[in-house]
Amino acid sequence: MRSWHIAFFGLLILALLVADVHFSGNDTEFSRYNYNWNGTSQFYDDAGSEIITDYSNLYGRKNSTLLMIEPDGKFTSSEITALMRFLRDGNKIFISDEPGNSNTLLGILGTGLSVTPANLSSTDSEYNNKRFIICYPYKEDGITAGVESVALNSPSVAEGGISLMRSSFLSWIDTNGNGKADATEPLGKRSVMVRDEAGQVYLLSDSSLFINRMYGYKRLRDNDRFIQNIMGLSDNLLVEYRHSAAASADGLSGILGALKSTDFIKISVIIIVTLLTILALAGRDK
């Protein structure tokens, strides 16, 4: 076999590998690299926002909102300092958190907000699923403008601050998981979204809003409008990508994720196609 044949097929194999990297992913919940139903790939592809991995990049920001999806709560003192300065500069933080991992951070920031992990259920639900509950705006705020109802999947309870969104009266904390409101489980409205008194920190006790299955279904209540409001809280949307579950990609998945950037794929394709063309023309002339 001639040398140009070897080079040609070698580049062809490389092109296939690049395509495989681009379309591969993982199955980690909320991961940006998870293209399955429980990933957040669709939201991140559409958001097109600046990714924050180094908290020093928060300094000097104006009129910006930092979005944190399921943060792990393992913040360093320098990161907390950066967040405090970020808020002092008049910016906003939106946190979606079901298990309550952000409670320590919320306390340090002095927000008075927290998440109480709970099996919040309701007969006012979508698809006759008591865990797929419908929630309603409770007080006026820009984040709920044009929103009449939102469907959330297995939310917890948001506490403190000003309640902005609640479940209906036909809701209860299903402590025993039997899907029924027992005598020891009183009915009542529960908050699923709150904000601090300063109007700078928002807390949503559910992150399913951003997963592919729900985000991709544009006709699900007013979920799409709600997400657009979140993204439009400020002129600039920044997406936290150091502690958020969206960044979950260990080992090879993390490497593949880094290679999946649009610029890398475009440059790789251009180079490979150019070389393949040159080799093909060179081989034809021989």
Please provide the spans of the model-predicted regions.
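Short, surface-exposed patches at the edges or C-terminal ends of soluble domains, predominantly
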Residues: 1-286
